[in-house]
Swiss-Prot record:
Major localization class: nucleus
Main function: Transcription factor required for protein utilization and degradation. Regulates transcription of major secreted proteases including a serine alkaline protease (alp1) and a metalloprotease (NpI).
UniProt-recorded Gene Ontology molecular function terms: DNA-binding transcription factor activity, RNA polymerase II-specific; transcription cis-regulatory region binding; zinc ion binding
Keyword entries, A-Z: DNA-binding, Metal-binding, Nucleus, Transcription, Transcription regulation, Zinc
Protein name, as recorded: Transcriptional activator of proteases prtT
Pfam family, one: Zn_clus
One of the record's GO cellular component terms: nucleus
Coiled coil: none
Family: Belongs to the prtT family.
Source organism of this protein record: Aspergillus oryzae (strain ATCC 42149 / RIB 40)
PANTHER family listed in its UniProt record: FINGER DOMAIN PROTEIN, PUTATIVE-RELATED (PTHR31845), TRANSCRIPTIONAL ACTIVATOR OF PROTEASES PRTT (PTHR31845:SF34)
Any GO BP annotation: regulation of protein catabolic process
DNA-binding region (UniProt annotation): 52-81
C-alpha cells in the first residue's frame, strides 16, 4: 500500500471574522453587521475571552457581571479571580456609573463637589439673566463686569460668622426676656376689620395724622405735601394710609393704646396680604413697604417685624415693578418719576444692609443693582438726606466686607483705610457746612452737621461693630475696649442733643444703635452717667409703653442692674441673674397722660411738647430706678435738646 504524504493543513481564518463587529450601547453583546449570517459557517461560535483562569481550567461557564470584579465561582470559593486583560474587558469595565472597584468618596469630597456644582449653576443662571433680549443689542460692559467678580456686593457668611456681633438680635432677645412677647400675631382683635376701617378714627383726627405724617415721615418716600397723598391713597383699605396713621400716632399720645394697637395689627395683616400679591405692585404699595422697612419695630407689643426678610422681599418686588431687571443704571434718564423710584430703592437697600449687619446675615444684592443708588444724586431736587442714605449704603457695605475678612479682623486695626477714605469722600455731610444759595432741603429735615442729624451715629456704630468683631480674637485688648467706650459715648451724647420732635421721627435703626451703645457702656463701665441720662431721655420720649423708646429704656435699666450685680460680690442673690423683679409690672398708666379718649374735636390733639408730662422717678418700680443715680426728675425741655 502506497503511503502518500499529507501536506499540513494551514488554518485560515474564515472571512466572517474579519468583518466589522459592533458593540451595543450596554457593552454586553456583540452584534454582527446585517447580512453576516449568510456567510458565517455553521457550528462555529465565537466565544468571548472574558473567562477567568479558574473557570478556563475547570472548563466551566464563567458567570461574570460586566460591572463586577470577580465571577460567582471565585466568589463562592473565596479565591482571587484572575481575569484576562483584553480590550473587550477594558471596554466592558468602563460603565457610566462608578464600578465597585472605585473607592467611595468621602463626605467632604462630595460636599466640595456639590458646592462646586452649585457655584457653576449660579454663574450660569446669572449669565442667563444678564443676557436679556431687551439689552442684547446694547453694549453693557458694567453689567458683564458685575457678574461673579471681586466687585460684587454679594457677601456670603464667613468661617467665623457665628462669632460676629448681632446687636439687633441681642436687643430683641433681651426685650423678649423682659417683656415676654407673644410668638404670633393674634388673628382676631376687637377693633380689627370693617368696623375699624369705617371710622374708629374720625375724619378730623385722620386729617391731622396725615399732616403729621407728611411733615415728619413723608419726604423719605417722596411725599412732601398733602397733594402728594392722592385720593386713592386715602382709602381706609390702603396700606399706605394705615401705615401713615400708625407712624403719626406717636405725635398724638391722646389716642388710646387699644386703638394704636389695633392700627398696628391692621398694618401687619395688610402687609402680609400685599406681599402675596402678583407683581408688579403699585407705587403707593411700595411706599408703604419702604416705611415698614424703615420703622419695623414701631409697635412693640407683638414680636417685631423681621426687617431683613421684609426688605429682601420688597427689593424683589421693586426690581420687577421698576423694571430694573431689563436695564442697566447708565440707561436711566433721571426725571421726577425715576427719582421717586430711586428714593424708594435706596430705602430698601439701606434697610437690607441695616439688618444684614445687625443680625450677622448675608447680603446677596449684586453690584449692578447697587449702582442705581447714587443715580438719585444726579437729580436737581436731590436733598442732603438723599446723600446721607447713599453714603450709609456705602458705609455698611464697607463694614460687611471688613467683617468678612478674617485676616483683617485678626490684625485688630483701630483705623481702617476703607473707613478713612469714606470719611474723606463724605466729609461735607459729616461736618458743619454752610448752605450757599437757595436751599433745596425740606424745612422739616436737618441740614448736614446740625444737632438734629443722626448720620454720624451710623459711622460710630460700624466702627464699634468692627472693634467688637476684632475682640473675638483679642478679648483682652485695652485699645479696642477704649475705642468701643469712646464710640458708645459719642453715640449717646449725640442722641441726647436731639429735640423730642426730631427723636420721634428717626428710623428704628437709630434706636438700635443707641441701645447697643448703652449696652456697651453697661458692659465695660456701668457707672457711666450717660447710661442714666439716655435711659431717662428714652423714658420721657416714649408716647406710650408700646413704643420702642419705652422698651429700650426699660431694657437699659435692667441690663445695667444685672451688670452691677455681676460686679458686686456682696449682692449675690439666688436667681438674680435671670429675674427681672417687679419691672414687668411697669405700666405707663401710672403716668398722668392726657385723657385716654378719642375727642372728636381737633383741638383735643395738641402738639407733642404740650402733651409730654414731667415723669417723676417714684412713678416707676424700684427694679428700674434702683440702678440709676437719679435724685430728681428731669423736666422736659431742661436738657439741651
Amino acid at each position: 500500500m502506497t503511503r502518500t504524504t499529507v501536506e499540513p493543513i494551514k488554518y485560515e481564518a474564515p472571512s466572517w471574522e474579519h468583518k466589522s463587529v459592533h458593540v451595543s450601547d450596554d457593552h454586553r453583546r456583540i452584534i454582527p453587521n446585517v447580512g453576516d449570517d449568510a456567510t458565517r459557517p455553521k457550528g462555529r461560535i465565537r466565544r468571548s475571552m472574558t473567562a477567568c483562569n479558574t473557570c478556563r481550567k475547570l472548563k466551566t461557564r464563567c458567570d461574570l457581571d460586566p460591572r463586577g470584579h470577580a465571577c460567582r465561582r471565585c466568589l463562592s470559593l473565596r479565591i482571587d479571580c484572575q481575569l484576562p486583560e483584553t480590550s473587550e474587558r477594558f471596554q466592558d469595565s468602563t460603565p457610566m456609573w462608578s464600578d465597585a472597584t472605585t473607592a467611595i468618596p468621602s463626605i467632604e469630597e462630595r460636599l466640595t463637589s456639590l458646592e462646586r456644582s452649585m457655584r457653576e449653576m449660579t454663574g450660569m443662571l446669572r449669565q442667563i439673566l444678564n443676557q436679556s433680549p431687551s439689552v442684547s443689542n446694547i453694549s453693557v460692559p458694567p453689567l458683564a463686569r458685575s457678574v461673579h467678580t471681586e466687585e460684587t456686593a454679594s457677601i456670603e457668611g464667613n468661617s467665623f460668622g457665628p462669632f460676629l456681633p448681632k446687636p439687633v438680635r441681642l436687643i430683641q432677645d433681651l426685650q423678649s426676656e423682659f417683656f415676654g412677647e407673644t410668638n404670633r400675631i393674634p388673628v382676631e382683635s376687637p377693633f380689627l376689620g370693617n368696623s375699624f376701617e369705617k371710622g374708629i378714627l374720625d375724619s378730623k383726627l385722620s386729617l391731622k395724622l396725615v399732616q403729621l405724617f407728611v411733615d415728619n415721615f413723608g419726604p423719605l418716600v417722596s411725599i412732601n405735601n398733602q397733594s402728594d397723598f392722592h385720593n386713592e391713597m386715602r382709602n381706609t383699605d390702603s396700606l399706605l394710609y394705615s401705615t401713615a396713621c400708625l407712624l403719626a400716632s406717636r405725635y398724638v399720645p391722646g389716642i388710646p393704646p387699644p386703638i394704636v394697637h389695633t392700627m398696628n395689627l391692621q398694618v401687619r395683616h395688610k402687609a402680609v396680604n400685599l406681599l402675596w400679591e402678583k407683581p408688579p405692585l403699585k407705587y403707593e404699595s411700595l411706599q408703604a413697604l419702604a416705611l415698614l422697612c424703615l420703622w419695623p419695630a414701631a409697635g412693640q407689643k407683638e414680636f417685631p417685624i423681621d426687617g431683613w426678610l421684609l426688605s429682601g422681599t420688597a427689593i424683589n418686588h421693586a426690581l420687577v415693578s421698576f423694571d430694573f431687571l431689563n436695564h442697566v443704571p447708565s440707561e436711566l434718564l433721571i426725571d421726577n418719576d425715576i427719582a421717586a423710584q430711586l428714593r424708594l430703592w435706596n430705602a430698601f437697600c439701606l434697610t437690607q444692609l441695616h439688618f444684614a449687619v445687625g443680625n450677622a446675615r448675608p447680603f446677596h444684592l449684586p453690584q449692578r443693582y447697587l449702582d442705581y443708588c447714587p443715580r438719585l444724586l444726579e437729580h436737581p431736587a436731590a436733598t442732603v438726606e438723599d446723600g446721607k442714605v447713599v453714603a450709609e449704603i456705602q458705609l455698611y457695605l464697607i463694614t460687611l466686607r471688613l467683617q468678612a475678612n478674617e485676616q483683617r479682623m485678626r490684625f485688630a486695626e483701630v483705623e481702617y483705610e476703607e473707613i478713612e477714605r469714606w470719611k474723606v469722600e463724605w466729609a461735607h455731610l459729616l461736618g458743619k457746612v454752610k448752605q450757599r444759595g437757595p436751599s433745596r432741603i425740606n424745612a422739616n429735615y436737618s441740614t448736614a452737621g446740625d444737632e438734629n442729624s443722626t448720620f454720624e451715629l451710623s459711622l460710630w456704630f460700624c466702627q464699634i461693630l468692627l472693634h467688637r468683631t476684632a475682640m473675638r480674637f483679642q478679648a483682652e485688648s485695652e485699645r479696642l475696649t477704649s475705642e468701643i467706650l469712646q464710640g458708645s459715648r459719642l453715640i449717646i451724647s449725640k442722641f441726647l442733643q436731639l429735640r423730642f420732635v426730631t427723636a420721634l421721627r428717626v428710623v428704628d435703626q437709630a434706636y438700635f444703635i443707641v441701645g447697643y451703645a448703652a449696652l456697651n457702656l453697661c458692659d465695660f463701665n456701668f457707672l457711666d452717667p450717660l447710661i442714666d441720662q439716655i435711659q431717662m431721655f428714652l423714658l420721657h420720649l416714649s408716647p406710650n409703653e408700646d413704643h420702642i423708646a419705652y422698651r429700650f429704656s426699660c431694657m437699659i435699666a435692667e441690663f445695667k442692674r444685672r451688670c452691677a450685680e455681676c460686679n458686686d460680690p456682696c449682692s449675690a442673690v439666688d436667681g438674680s441673674q435671670c429675674s427681672f423683679g417687679d419691672a414687668r409690672k411697669m405700666s405707663m398708666e401710672q403716668v398722668q397722660f392726657v385723657p385716654p379718649l378719642v375727642d372728636s374735636m381737633i383741638g383735643g390733639y395738641s402738639a407733642l411738647e404740650q402733651l409730654i408730662p414731667e415723669v417723676m422717678p417714684h412713678s416707676f418700680p424700684e427694679s428700674v430706678i434702683s440702678g440709676m443715680a437719679v435724685t430728681e426728675a428731669i423736666p422736659v425741655g431742661s436738657a439741651p435738646y
